[in-house]
């Protein structure tokens, strides 16, 4: 027997042993031999790794669903993944079996959270007591019975947004970021100092942007090789460490400085603070001699800081899509303005008390959230243990992706789903409760559903109503005065945003400029 033959036999034995071991391991985990959900066939060892789409994967998964159905199984390097393409499947698993599907993965991206000192953001926390304590604190001050306390802040900042649009209409995308950043910073800490809040918004934006950039596939090698997080920053190729150091400083400042300033203000009265998460949480803390004071203050500090990181990017993206949709559909603007004028008149601007009387504007906000799905694949859920569902086996530790984009663009639920049509939610001039509300999916599922959804919805409504009351929005014009066609195209990130676009804002009447000067 030649040496070459011996090597081939040895290699064959290793391969056979590997497959036997893998098969036995899977059999042990799945003793009843249940089938896995259907999905594209992968390769040995690497599974479906080379098939995973990198650009707008939600579109590919929706297309695969035509072949494999609304529950698909993929595997990459041994990591099982479940793709859900329908609302009913998502509710079955993530709502009805939430105890098993509320965890988050520990992946290299989470290591980046540690490098950036972002491990205080409870959206990334593992499911357990620590996560529950943070969510409880957040929900205590942002539940649907509490958000009315923040309506004055939303109204003040929305009027400032309108004034900025009058002064610098070309910067409308930046104005939307500032609007929602300012609302959330004020609700988080209660400071009315505009310049100070502006600094806080800019720092929080830098932190959110840095994180979003860091998790783009291929952006940093540390995502693929976690051991690189221990490489010193001075080594060639370790530039990510310097970026992480910069973001870590911002994170530490974002977490500590404003919270400590609120504590000092409440203690000494050296500056004015209004109703906010931080004020409420600090005032509810036990005496400093209490055994749990330190741990409770950590939760209060984290909860106050995470408001912006957790919510601003998604709300800004929705707002920018809403403005784009209005610029593309002047007929929608006219109908909304007719409703607004009938409710508000022309002697004041809309406020939150007008919301129940403006179903068409509410429908615009709902449709914007469906038409542009900000989180097309949501945040990853993880199965805490193996499960059987509809005759299929779901392994422990499976990554669960809900294809929210597919749900929101299902033609069986939403006729002509690529069309922006607020009237799909209306019947006899009122919200039609028989039509699926996009909020059933766009804010997440189960115990991981977004706790800031009521605040976000109110902020978007007020922006839409105030914007439509004050301005006509139009597509930009070319040199000949002809309108330049607009369309919705988005980034391919975890949180998608409309690609930059232009539009024009025209005051409906000088009266509105005068109102805003009062």
UniProtKB/Swiss-Prot annotation:
Q: Which UniProt keywords apply?
A: Glycoprotein, Heme, Iron, Membrane, Metal-binding, Monooxygenase, Oxidoreductase, Transmembrane, Transmembrane helix
Q: What topology does the record note for this protein and the membrane?
A: Single-pass membrane protein
Tell me the pathway. Answer: Secondary metabolite biosynthesis
| TM annotation in the entry | 7-25
> Quick check: keyword Heme in the entry?
yes
Report a single Gene Ontology molecular function: iron ion binding
Recorded hits in SUPFAM superfamilies, A to Z, give:
Cytochrome P450
Highest taxon of source:
Eukaryota
Q: Which Pfam families match?
A: p450 (PF00067)
Grouped into one coarse class, the protein's main location is: membrane
Q: Which GO terms describe its cellular component?
A: membrane
EC number(s) on record? 1.-.-.-
Per the UniProt annotation, where are the glycans attached? 48, 100, 292, 302, 351, 457
**Cofactor(s) annotated in UniProt:** heme
Answer yes or no on keyword Ion transport.
no
Task: Report the subcellular localization.
Answer: Membrane
UniProt cross-references to CDD domains, sorted A to Z: CYP64-like
Q: Which residues bind heme?
A: 450
Instruction: Give the first-level EC class, as a single word.
Output: oxidoreductase
Record's family?
Belongs to the cytochrome P450 family.
What is its biological role? Answer: Cytochrome P450 monooxygenase; part of the gene cluster that mediates the biosynthesis of alpha-cuprenene and oxidized derivatives. The alpha-cuprenene synthase COP6 is the only sesquiterpene synthase identified in C.cinereus that appears to be part of a biosynthetic gene cluster and is highly specific since it catalyzes the cyclization of (2E,6E)-farnesyl diphosphate into only one product, alpha-cuprenene.
What name does the UniProt record give this protein?
Cytochrome P450 monooxygenase COX1
The protein's organism comes out as Coprinopsis cinerea (strain Okayama-7 / 130 / ATCC MYA-4618 / FGSC 9003) (Inky cap fungus)
